[in-house]
């Protein structure tokens, strides 16, 4: 196994909260996949959830080498959790196609948040 891609991103939770205050659910609907939106609508701390998901999706797009461009969208990256709470990242759409063409077999994700910031790192492995 070899590392094919690595991406990291940090998001300012206060900044995301300001965007959320201006645009309401429109920002969430632009970046979240349908399964993530279900969770988002059930939460009180929506900005924190959005900031973490935004950081993950940016980190994943950097690991792919595309950014959010070349047909890759925020909704191509879907965050879920296993039964112990470990974050999992799955790819769909153009992101999945690119990952397959690059030989990606494993996707690793870690994310954290503290007061004002959310950070995520994604590793793509063969």
From Swiss-Prot:
One of its GO terms (biological process) is fatty acid biosynthetic process. It holds the Pfam family ACPS. It comes from Photobacterium profundum (strain SS9). GO terms for cellular component: cytoplasm. Keywords: Cytoplasm, Fatty acid biosynthesis, Fatty acid metabolism, Lipid biosynthesis, Lipid metabolism, Magnesium, Metal-binding, Transferase. HAMAP family: AcpS. It catalyses: apo-[ACP] + CoA = holo-[ACP] + adenosine 3',5'-bisphosphate + H(+). Mg(2+) binds at residues 9, 58. InterPro entries: 4-PPantetheinyl_Trfase_dom, 4-PPantetheinyl_Trfase_dom_sf, ACPS, Ppantetheine-prot_Trfase_dom. Transfers the 4'-phosphopantetheine moiety from coenzyme A to a Ser of acyl-carrier-protein. Its main location: cytoplasm. It is found in: Cytoplasm. Its cofactor is Mg(2+). GO terms for molecular function: holo-[acyl-carrier-protein] synthase activity; magnesium ion binding. It is an enzyme of class 2 (transferase). This is Holo-[acyl-carrier-protein] synthase. Belongs to the P-Pant transferase superfamily. AcpS family. Its EC number is 2.7.8.7. It comes from the Bacteria.
